[in-house]
A protein has these predicted regions:
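Glycine/proline-rich, positively charged
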Residues: 1-48, 52-61, 67-74, 135
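Structured C-terminal cap/extension of enzyme domains
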Residues: 41-43, 61-174
């Protein structure tokens, strides 16, 4: 920070850099420790942050700082493997219950997100995941990636579908 950031700021003043950004390593830092340290210094114009229905912790520890400092966010990991593959989701939920991050009484064994899947206003878990991220206060852009044109259209349609129903958002927050 003491060496690189001052030089980046000089280059920004010269017009050679338009925006300064920083990306967390969400897999290695799921509690956003680096961003909690970096954002209060107010050097960055944009951050790339992991945020999804399985780990929405950025809502409490990152977004308040980005909103306060007018920092844009690029949401990554909106749809993780676990949200697109039922077996992977069951495995992750079991791990979260075992670690104490999720209360076992709040989930159905083998069907943790049944209330999302069964809701008439939600086409799929993947759609719900994109809607969850895209309409979060503090989320600027939700990244999506695919090599399949049909999937890309579905992802864009999901992002544009509007926020999740209140009862779904409330239940996911539990």
């Amino acid at each position: 920070v003491n060496e690189i950031v001052p030089e980046l700021l000089k280059q920004k003043e010269k017009g050679k850099i338009r925006f300064l950004g920083i990306t967390e390593q969400f897999i290695a830092d799921p509690s956003h420790e680096m961003l909690k340290l970096a954002l209060p210094d107010d050097y960055f114009d944009v951050v790339m942050v992991g945020f999804n229905m399985i780990n929405p912790s950025a809502r409490d520890v990152v977004f308040p700082l980005t909103i306060e400092n007018n920092v844009a966010t690029q949401i990554m990991f909106a749809v993780r493997r676990a949200l697109s593959k039922p077996d992977a989701l069951a495995e992750v939920i079991d791990q979260l219950i075992e670690s104490g991050d999720i209360e076992a009484s709040l989930v159905e064994p083998g069907a943790a997100l049944w209330f999302v899947e069964d809701h008439e206003e939600i086409a799929s878990i993947v759609q719900a995941a994109y809607r969850f991220c895209s309409h979060e206060p503090g989320a600027t852009i939700t990244l999506t990636g695919t090599g399949n044109e049909d999937h890309l259209k579905q992802n864009v349609d999901s992002i544009l579908a509007g926020p999740l129903p209140v009862e779904i958002s409330t239940r996911l927050s539990e």
